[in-house]
Amino acid sequence: MNYKLLLLILLLSGCSSEIFTRYQVITLEGDTFDLDVKVLITEDTAWAVKYVRQNLDSTVKSSDFDGRGATFGSIDGKSPIIWLPTTDDASIVNHELIHATINVMQWAGIVLNDSTEEVYGYEMQHLTKEFYNQITKIKQNAYTTRK
């Protein structure tokens, strides 16, 4: 088939370039607290803006994605969303995971103080373990697929 004809068919069928965009969404399932955390991994900030607007907060702006990561807190009980362009820097991942931890705990009505510090620690531990377990599986699957 002629590539020009294929391109024309795609354009006329309303095919968006978004289907060709590489991104990954993982869900860190709630454990003690019944609130999942979504993690959107993509360098495509236009896609990230669209995803967060559709799934959590219609007021986000492109400038909200100017950093090395961002966390958008729960609204009306919807899952908070962490955006990361990559998962390469553990310090940035952990930075965003602490924001998500604080958000989950606020959603649950638990204020950080000396008597709740351990609960915050357990939630952070849970989210971190969930994140790295899923990232490890994704990387293993990608490696297996390339073989």
Question: Model-found features: residue ranges?
Answer:
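Sec-dependent signal peptide cleavage junction
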Residues: 19-23, 142-147
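Catalytic Zn2+-binding segment of zinc metalloproteases
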Residues: 97-114
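A short, structured loop/turn motif at beta-sheet edges
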Residues: 93-95
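C-terminal motif of bacterial Sec signal peptides marking the signal peptidase cleavage site
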Residues: 13-14
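Short, charged/polar N-terminal "headpieces" of proteins
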Residues: 18-54
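Sec-dependent signal peptide recognition
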Residues: 1-8
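Active-site scaffold of zinc-dependent metalloenzymes
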Residues: 45-90, 100-104
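Post-HExxH zinc-binding segment in Zn-dependent metallohydrolases
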Residues: 112-145
